[in-house]
A protein has these predicted regions:
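Active-site catalytic microenvironments in core metabolic enzymes, especially phosphate/sugar-handling
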Residues: 1-262
Length: 262
């Protein structure tokens, strides 16, 4: 098996052509011609993940977030990105990321959020091409809920310890917009689409001042997207059922954000 065989299969699920212009999805370290004997799937490409891959005999790491996102001027072993790059190269581990490519397919990040909330009539929030790909999604709750009810519902479905929210609506909520990861820039669009609730992450302070009849929730960047790791693994095992594909055993400790006082 070659690296290119694995990445080609992932790109059927999440095509590189749909990534955002600022993104760096794709093969980041290694060659499509490199031989691969095992794949390790994680969320962020950290030195710890590379070490885990090597210990498992994996020579390809697949993550959601790209290891190299913007241009870098130096590779420093004291920096987490630099350390991961050096460790991957020294160990002969190829590194691949499916970032906004996985955000923009309905079977990916936002679609997983919708399925977790059992939304009905789900469609792409920011449709592109023929309407089958794009950022975010929007759908209807099975049962209308007040703001406090939906807060409890989301907390339970996503297994959250905390949610940052604007003032909970007292009127029934039916239409919900979702965007995994940093979605603060799409708040106005969610409102324009008729959503009464918008669930995303990385919302800035002033965006919690919402107009009447609209509510936002910030459930955390990691928490909103982490299910994509299981989706990647399922895709690989479906296409290569006898190949060694692993999910990182450290996912429970992978979130770089730590919550205290809960």
């Amino acid at each position: 098996m070659k690296v290119g065989d694995i990445t080609a299969a992932l790109e059927v699920f999440a095509p590189l052509r749909i990534q955002e212009s600022w993104d760096n999805s794709g093969l980041i370290i290694g060659s499509p011609e490199d031989e691969v004997h095992g794949v390790m799937v994680g969320f962020d490409c950290t030195p710890e993940l590379i070490k885990e891959a090597v210990e498992k005999g994996c020579d390809l790491v697949v993550t959601h977030h790209p290891l190299i996102f913007k241009g870098i001027k130096r590779i420093d072993s004291k920096d987490p990105v630099g350390a991961a790059i050096m460790q991957a190269v020294r160990s002969g581990v190829a590194v691949y990321a499916a970032h906004t490519t996985a955000d923009k397919v309905i079977a990916g990040v936002s679609g997983a959020m919708a399925r977790r909330l059992s939304l009905k009539n789900v469609s792409i929030m920011v449709p592109e091409e023929d309407g089958t790909v794009g950022l975010g999604c929007i759908g209807d709750l099975e049962t209308p809920m007040t703001g406090k009810e939906v807060l409890a519902f989301v907390k339970e479905r996503f297994h959250l310890g905390v949610i940052r929210s604007s003032k909970p609506l007292e009127t029934p909520i039916t239409k919900v917009a979702l965007l995994g990861g940093s979605g603060g820039g799409e708040i106005q669009l969610a409102m324009a689409k008729g959503a009464q609730l918008y669930i995303t992450a990385d919302i800035s302070y002033h965006n919690f001042f919402t107009p009447e009849g609209f509510m936002v929730m910030d459930i955390g960047h990691f928490e909103s997207e982490v299910e994509i790791v299981d989706i990647f693994l399922a895709e690989l095992r479906k296409k290569f059922p006898t190949f060694a594909s692993y999910k990182s055993a450290n996912m429970g400790r992978s979130n770089p954000v730590h919550y205290f006082g809960l």
